[in-house]
Amino acid sequence: MKKRRFVFLSIVLVTIMMFPVVLTAEEENTEDKEDQSNDNIPSHVLDISKENTYPNTKKDQTYLEPNDLANELIESSKVKIENPEFIKMLNESSLKPSKLAFGYRGEIYLGHWPLNYKSDESSMNWEYQEINVNVLNNLGGKEKKTLNYVQEKEKRVKGGLTSKTERAEDVKKMIQMKAQSSTDLPLAFETVIGAGTKKDQTYGVSPKNVGYLHAYAPALNEKGVVTYGEVYLILKGSKKKLEVRNVTKQGIGAWIPIQDHASFSFQLKSN
């Protein structure tokens, strides 16, 4: 009886000791998956910024810091305000109500604005748009030949919103700012690959085959919700605040190309 009890306790003890190890392994695997989904660039996607014959303009999306007045008004709103154009307007405004303005009341309509963007889903399409095809015919050849990427024509790749919306440029800026905060890849709604851009990587084309090297521009796909509202400046004596009325939400999506990057796909065909 004592022997059975000892065996049982030993099994329980071993199980308890192993259990945390299993949990740790699962947590590590989860972290690995998260790392893979964040800027995990496949080996067939290459940075062509140094080789690109067209100098793309780097338009860094920086957060516009509100000044003291703008910050005070933004914090007074019950609806989050992140639109950089609206913040810029507040920064350029001045408001100094008199401290002696007892009983004074007023409201100023500032317009109908997209106020913030909430991202629900973000995914990468490494073959968003084909930009070039290089072909090497070795059907009659007797030796292996090599093929490499050379951009034959200038290619302009544009992204954009997936549906119409009010103040589309403001919405694009908010979406790009939100997307850029979660990736180190250079995002831009437009990128250009210049003619003559090339990479040194070679692809072998054996005899009696035709080699096809396809090049694509990658892009990030964003899906989320934009919050709109009518913004009023409320003045009451020496106090001031922003009030947002008639709040609406709209589902929106966007494609944002990855600047100065190309994805490659190589195929061999025999005829």
Predicted feature residues:
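A glycine-rich, hydrophobic loop/mini-helix early in the fold
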Residues: W113, Y117-E152
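An N-terminally focused, membrane-permeabilizing/fusogenic/translocator signature enriched
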Residues: M1-F6, T15-K118, S122
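Short low-complexity stretches enriched in small and charged residues
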Residues: E75-F86, E127-L136, K142, L185
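Membrane-insertion modules used to breach or fuse lipid bilayers
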Residues: E143-Q201, G229, S238-N271
